[in-house]
Swiss-Prot record:
It is found in: Periplasm. Pfam families: LolA. This is Outer-membrane lipoprotein carrier protein. Participates in the translocation of lipoproteins from the inner membrane to the outer membrane. Only forms a complex with a lipoprotein if the residue after the N-terminal Cys is not an aspartate (The Asp acts as a targeting signal to indicate that the lipoprotein should stay in the inner membrane). It comes from Pseudomonas fluorescens (strain ATCC BAA-477 / NRRL B-23932 / Pf-5). Keywords: Chaperone, Periplasm, Protein transport, Signal, Transport.
Amino acid sequence: MRLIRMLLLPVLAVTTLSAHADPKDVARLTQLLEKSQTLTARFSQLTLDGSGTQLQETAGEMSLQRPGLFYWHTDAPQEQLMVSDGQKVSLWDPDLEQVTIKKLDQRLTQTPALLLSGDVSKISESFDITSKEAGGVMDFTLKPKTRDTLFDSLRLSFRNGMINDMQLIDSVGQRTNILFTGVKANEAIPASKFKFDIPKGADVIQE
């Protein structure tokens, strides 16, 4: 559960750091993100500890739509479903038959999935951004301007102008790598995709 929470759920951030972002990097990243109003893809997710030892590997499908809508389904045997309707987030764990519901934190540093589905017009207020390009791949490294976030740095990689993968590194060096395949942008997604109906008999936790 930690992996999906790291990507999609918030933590408290209280201390501001001094940082900066190159205006050209900010403009280019913002343009790449904003041109996709919807995204659908398969994903594979790999988590390694600080020494490079594999901790967990999962796969699934995701759908995103601006502003703030997302559907993130992890396949069995570690099945989970996270759905945001833009106001609240529902996390369904079928093994526990439990739904956790909480308000969506709109801050990009607290809910990294919003980088792909939220308002990124003021992204430089949240991150120090640098970029590099090689072999047709554009990498952007984002470092939060606050302490006590879930991650110390986040990398977004684009191939041919489309999101290809992302990596999150936490304070102890643990890396979560997410590779997207079959990416489709700006195709209509049914509104029902972003609505979660609580299964009958499920335990409900409101946070």
